[in-house]
Amino acid sequence: MISLDLSPTLWKSPDKEGELKKQGHVVKNWKKRKFIIQNDMLFYFKDKEERPVGAVPLRMSRCYENKSLGKPNCFELVSPRINKTFFIQANTPDEMASWMKAVEKGSEYSTVSQPFNLKHEVHVDFNSATGFSGLPKEWEVILKSSNVSKQEVLDKPSEWLSVLEFQAGRTMEKSNSQNLSALPDESNLTLSDLVTKEDPTKIYKNMTKIGEGAAGEVFVATSSKNNKRVAIKKIEINNDNAKLLVTEIAIMKTSHHDNIVNYIDSYIVNDRELWVAMEFMGGGCLTDILEAFDNIKMSEIQIAYVVKETLKALQYIHSLHRIHRDIKSDNILLGSEGSVKIADFGYAAQLTQKQQKRNTVVGTPYWMAPELIRGHDYGVKVDIWSLGIMMMEMAEGEPPYMDFPPLRALFLITTKGIPPLKETTKWSKTFQDFFSKCLDINVANRPDATDLLKHPFMDLACDSSEFKPLIQAARNV
């Protein structure tokens, strides 16, 4: 009988192997990994472990050099089968070229594969001769590389299928952005209706790149109108994201709150690029503090402060019947004076009278609420769950289940909820009570933003002057 453990036969005759650096998908640091390409699959391994920590289907993938990452010999690998982009760094230009050629060969591998998109009628079974039956080959490999045992699948087949369908749904929804409706009164609007007709290249000077995300690049510039610094987000416009950008800009233009990054204006440049001008937050993002976790720890009163300021913004957003859907440390920006503001409305949704719940699958997996992963209808309380996960980030340096592959993490979130804090004695009973309420699996019992702002934990929050030194300390690490 074949074990569900990933068989070494999948990589024992590699077409190419070697050590490269890979950028993390959640924490954006670069780490060395051993890479192996065999046929139409790429595997990468941590240290000297015999099992891969990741498996990438190469069929139909795209690969090209990326010079915008600030590192030499970097290439970008896009795998449409799992709708993921990987940033990889080689040691030399020749090595980069040879790996890109190997990826290209894998993308054109000629054996016939099963359809990738799952159907709801799929029945997960295990056959000792063929492995998982009813699943595409790529998902079988990913299940195995996620250390999923045969018994686990047989014990909870419907739960595992739910997680697999969730991932397939994410791919489908991202490639069909028209499924996400724009604001109800603005469903016929286009980007041209929302942007300013001025030429931003004549308004914003001294532009310097300060970051890069999934959606585009971020720059800091000086406005010639008032000599103030602003942040400029540049996003390439295409058929997949045009509707989403309309929703994002419409929501940003109509969201005015002290704890939301201020929208200034937006422009279309050369008919293919959207520039969004926003308030510049000189303290960076909350993630910058968390990446210095080994040297800098947030105190309980500082965590309470960040949570309180975030909740004020969520209370306002939810009062407009909107959901942010991507609350995490990356999207919490900090002012150099200690202010805390929510940013990035790229996943935000507007609820209407007819549609008071959503079932669209978007967000970042490790921060996602169980009801969202299961594909159930959901409302504003998914943001409260994500806030609870962000509390764990601040308390422990990272979200739960980060040591597990995303697939297993999603399964654990839906079946077991969130594990307890590692050092419970370090945190007050008030902290722990607030934390547990945010992460209540029962949506009906999970409080809303208004209720949480009345919780005693909020009384512990420090003010911006006591948070400011933390921002400065993180810069110096």
Curated annotation (Swiss-Prot):
Coiled coil, from the record: none
Documented effect of changing residue 123 to L: High basal kinase activity, loss of response to chemoattractant, loss of racB binding
Disruption phenotype: Cells are less-polarized than wild-type and are unable to properly regulate the direction of pseudopod formation, resulting in a reduction in the distance traveled in response to chemoattractant.
Active site: 326 (proton acceptor)
Cofactor requirement: Mg(2+)
Broad class of where this protein is predominantly found: cytoplasm
GO function term, MF aspect, one: metal ion binding
Keyword terms, alphabetized: ATP-binding, Chemotaxis, Cytoplasm, Kinase, Magnesium, Membrane, Metal-binding, Nucleotide-binding, Serine/threonine-protein kinase, Transferase
Membrane-spanning ranges: none
Entries under Pfam families matching the protein: PBD, PH, Pkinase
Reported regulation of activity: Kinase activity is rapidly and transiently increased in response to chemoattractant stimulation.
Domain CRIB: 112-125
Top-level class of the enzyme under EC nomenclature: transferase
Effect annotated for changing residue 143 to F: High basal kinase activity but retains response to chemoattractant
InterPro entries: CRIB_dom, CRIB_dom_sf, Kinase-like_dom_sf, PAK3-like, PAK_BD, PH-like_dom_sf, PH_domain, Prot_kinase_dom
GO cellular component: cytoplasm; cytosol; plasma membrane
Keyword 4Fe-4S belongs to the record: no
Keyword hit for Cytoplasm: yes
Localization annotation: Cytoplasm; Membrane
PANTHER family per UniProt: SERINE/THREONINE-PROTEIN KINASE SAMKA-RELATED-RELATED, SERINE_THREONINE-PROTEIN KINASE SAMKA-RELATED
Subunit (UniProt): Interacts with GTP-bound racB.
Family: Belongs to the protein kinase superfamily. STE Ser/Thr protein kinase family. STE20 subfamily.
Function in brief: Has role in the regulation of chemotaxis.
Protein name: Serine/threonine-protein kinase pakC
Organism, scientific name: Dictyostelium discoideum
Recorded name of the encoding gene: pakC
